[in-house]
């Protein structure tokens, strides 16, 4: 899109910059940073429009515009000690590439005894994105995942984990294409409309980009298209599903009906053009997996379930009012002979049980799972509380206890993190190019704009803070679920070499 390249958020009526997107016009200017507040917007040399208490979507419309045009922002710097300080920042609008929500990869070196490690590839996929409409320049999920698989394969990955834990869905066509990277031709999903008509969407490309061991890591937040991928790969006995006991359970398709367009004989069709359109979202179709079972409400159950706070939180489809019930249709008559195709399948004799038993043993013995269960117990106790004291003394003590507990958690995470696995990051070329451009921009000296500041603020201070921010590394997140998935994958890989799956920590 064309804009300034900043993530904005409404903070109690004030439009606040929460993130400067890499490689965008805002970063190029070197004059904006996170937590700066936008108080006014002006087009070119025109007067400023006051945007305090204005709805965020209207502010965004004012800031966006044609490529090459200038927008001026009246900024209250976030780091200014004096709240009366203002500065005027002119920015030339340009193209902004969103890379934060694209697929990413990493290679985990999992210890496997005798000073050996097993390289396990991980592809994190936040959504199913792709080209929408003519002239779209967006990349696609399948193309991006293909690029990462090739990079991980070249790096020596012996197994791949497809991380769909925070994937809420997206384009159905991309879900079908992505599944095809791991199976030869075959059904992916059945779609039935309200009249009972059924359509089978299949992968028709006989080639497979990855035929090695495959784990799909899911959670209660994995919904819609991600459930189709997980369910299809499970039905084809192609992947092992690991994560929460089941996925979200969204197996329906909705369409937004604009009432004045869809109901020509109602009074809605007489509404004037400038009036707000009346719309309704209606469920029109339902998904079914190749085996005929719906993903609605029940979701896709895990082959190996890991303990999680998500199990008792009301975040699934079955927790919503008036959710459609689960159902089933006839299964598609299809089977892949993985032995004949020489493709790794988790349904090899005794393999599934061996992997599950080894994981269960670790869940009962490892310190990180004991810590996880303690955390879940504390959160459940808090969730089950139905009454809160109105005593100020009790509330203060509660705050103190909570802070002490959170500090304890942080200390435990830090201690566990010291023994985390070695990981190497793999990015898409478009993301690498964007990061390189960002580093190049940040290495350039800041250009001062005469007369752009109202009040006292030092450009040298801004330069120093940008430099400190660029050098600051994110603290690694100790991901218990990903670690266990990598260990399960390691057991699987080693089982290909030995008659029994080993239990590696």
Q: Which residues does each predicted region cover?
A:
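Conserved functional hotspot residues or short segments at active or partner-binding sites
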Residues: 288-290, 294-501
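A generic structural signal for well-ordered coil/turn residues at beta-strand boundaries
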Residues: 2, 85-87, 119, 276-283, ...
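Cleft-lining beta-strand/loop regions that shape enzyme active-site pockets
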Residues: 3, 7-34, 39-265, 286, ...
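Short, solvent-exposed mixed-charge patches
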Residues: 503-505
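Mixed-charge, polar/low-complexity N-terminal
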Residues: 7, 11-14, 18-20, 151, ...
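Polar, glycine-rich mid-to-C-terminal structural blocks
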Residues: 225, 237, 242-244, 248-317
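A general structural signal for short secondary-structure boundary/capping elements
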Residues: 206-208, 263-268, 327-334
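Amphipathic, alpha-helical segments enriched in basic
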Residues: 48-50, 204, 208, 270, ...
């Amino acid at each position: 899109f064309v804009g300034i390249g900043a993530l904005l958020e409404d903070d109690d009526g004030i439009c606040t910059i929460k993130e400067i997107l890499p490689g965008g016009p805002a970063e190029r200017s070197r004059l904006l940073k996170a937590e700066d507040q936008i108080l006014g917007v002006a087009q070119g040399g025109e007067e400023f429009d006051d945007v305090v208490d204005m709805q965020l979507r209207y502010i965004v419309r004012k800031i966006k515009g044609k490529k090459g045009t200038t927008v001026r922002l009246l900024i209250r710097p976030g780091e200014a000690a004096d709240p009366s300080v203002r500065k005027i920042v002119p920015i030339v609008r340009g193209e902004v590439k969103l890379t934060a929500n694209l697929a990413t990869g990493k290679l985990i070196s999992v210890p496997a005894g005798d000073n050996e490690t097993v390289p396990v590839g991980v592809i994190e996929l936040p959504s199913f994105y792709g080209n929408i409409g003519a002239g779209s320049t967006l990349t696609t999920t399948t193309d991006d995942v293909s690029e990462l698989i090739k990079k991980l394969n070249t790096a020596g990955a012996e197994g791949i984990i497809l991380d769909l834990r925070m994937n809420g869905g997206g384009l159905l066509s991309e879900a079908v294409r992505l599944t095809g990277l791991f199976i030869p031709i075959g059904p992916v999903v059945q779609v039935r409309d309200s009249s009972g008509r059924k359509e089978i969407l299949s992968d028709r490309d006989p080639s497979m980009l990855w035929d090695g061991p495959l784990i799909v890591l899911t959670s209660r937040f994995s919904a819609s298209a991600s459930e189709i991928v997980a369910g299809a790969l499970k039905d084809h006995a192609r992947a092992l599903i690991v994560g929460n006991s089941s996925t979200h359970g969204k197996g329906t398709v909705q369409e937004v009906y604009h009432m004045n367009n869809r109901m020509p004989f109602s009074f809605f069709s007489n509404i004037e053009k400038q009036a707000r359109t009346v719309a309704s979202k209606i469920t029109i179709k339902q998904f079914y997996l190749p085996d005929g079972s719906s993903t609605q409400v029940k979701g896709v159950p895990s082959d190996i379930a890991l303990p999680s706070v998500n199990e008792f939180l009301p975040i699934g489809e079955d927790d919503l009012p008036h959710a459609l019930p689960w159902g089933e249709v006839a299964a598609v008559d299809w089977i892949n002979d993985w032995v004949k195709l020489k493709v790794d399948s988790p349904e090899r004799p005794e393999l599934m049980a061996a992997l599950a038993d080894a994981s269960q043993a670790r869940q009962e013995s490892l310190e990180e799972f004991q810590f996880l269960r303690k955390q879940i117990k504390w959160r459940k106790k808090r969730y089950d509380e139905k009454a809160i004291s109105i005593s100020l003394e009790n509330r203060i003590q509660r705050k103190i206890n909570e802070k002490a507990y959170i500090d304890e958690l942080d200390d435990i995470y830090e201690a566990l993190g010291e023994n985390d696995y070695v990981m190497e990051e793999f990015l898409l070329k478009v993301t690498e190019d964007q990061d390189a451009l960002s580093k190049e921009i940040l290495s350039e000296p800041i250009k001062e704009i005469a007369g752009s500041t109202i009040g006292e603020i030092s450009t040298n201070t801004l330069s120093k803070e940008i430099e400190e921010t660029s050098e600051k590394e994110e603290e690694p997140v100790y991901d218990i679920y990903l670690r266990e998935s990598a260990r399960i994958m390691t057991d699987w890989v080693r089982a290909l070499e030995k008659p029994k799956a080993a239990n590696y920590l």
